[in-house]
Amino acid sequence: MSQYTDYIIIGAGSAGCVLANRLSSHSKNNVTLFEAGPSNNTWKVDMPSALLYVMHDPKYNWKYYTEPEPYLNNRSLYCPRGKMLGGCSSHNGMVFARGHKEDFDRWESYGLDQWSYNKVLPYYKKLETWSGKNNLRGKDGPLKVNKSQIDKKFPLFNAVLKAAKEAGYNIFDDSNSLSNEGFGTFDVTIDKGVRQSIPKAYLDPIKNRKNLQIVKKTYVKKIIFKDKVAIGVEYIKNNKTHYFYANKEVILSAGSINSPKILQLSGIGNAAHLKDFGIPIINDLKGVGENLQDHLEIYIQYKSKKKETLYDLSTNFISQGIEGSKWFTFKKGKLAHSHLELGGFVKTNKNYSHPNLQFHFFPSLVINHGLKNPTFDAFQFHACPNRPKSRG
């Protein structure tokens, strides 16, 4: 492999894959995409219901844990991050949810004039091929997005919608419309029973481009600087250290945890912190590796009187064999769904301008992040604040 290229992209997550596609579309650009993990070309990624298996496999996941949380009984919470082509798009729940219009417009009011809803809408439309009818949706983008029909296939999902309607909530038809307050089935990145990851949308169609090289199972340790200009990377492959250089740009796209980590190892961050580890200072930039903000989900769990949950599928080898044959043969059945495909957006205060709480419904129990199987029929609701205030 040549030790020089025009563009180095560190991290083949969602953004890295899109960048590799865009930059290599110009034949004069040579692009090298580095990924620490392996390919995502496995049935465990393609099968929508197998997401928990991938989410706990160290081959495909960084398996991070938070520092002990003082307001959560000092518990360390599991924080899965994708470690393969596609990053988290290869192991997430496949729910496709745009940000709310008012959230984008609030960013604009802070001075980010390129982040208003009207400015980002063309990119949302550009990326998707949506199966429904709506002039706010895309028709010929690389990512296939479909409205889930899970409520028409499994009675428990339909019962949730009926309950929401009886409780006075709106039942929306398009979860990504301008007015999505209420409950309904979500849009999903599942097409014909198969996960539509970002590599499937952005890398597979261009894998034969001669000016793009994708280097997997390669850990980028740090960025190399010359006169405070990024000129290359130091990386580890097969337990050996190598160096690679960019004629034009080094693009750091390694996610919300690994990007600041690489910056710090490269000498960019809080100087006092870096000195503790003997790292030469390139730029004393406070804030790097701090202020992480995430959404904390709370599970509300109920025992079910009816055997319409996923309990049998998660514990019965015969059921697993039957459903497995349906998926591997026809890409149909229970395994063709993530089962996180129904929920809602609500306001906890009627005076709020738009929803601040999101719900997901799941027809089983998730115990210890899915590491332990349930022992009876049950279901749960996931409650998640859309605009949390806490920061790391």
Describe these PLM feature segments.
Residues M1-K126, L285, H295-S304:
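N-terminal glycine-rich phosphate/pyrophosphate-binding loop and immediately adjacent elements
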Residues C17-N21, K200, P260, Q264:
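Short, hydrophobic alpha-helix immediately C-terminal to the catalytic nucleophile
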Residues N30, G37-T42, I223-K226, G232-I322:
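Glycine-rich loop(s) and the adjacent beta-strand/alpha-helix scaffold that form part
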Residues A50-L51, K63, F183-D191, V215-V229, ...:
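A glycine-rich dinucleotide-binding beta-alpha-beta segment and adjacent secondary-structure elements
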Residues E108-A230, I236, Y299-I322:
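Conserved redox-cofactor binding core of oxidoreductases
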Residues Q301-G392:
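FAD cofactor-binding and catalytic pocket of flavoenzymes
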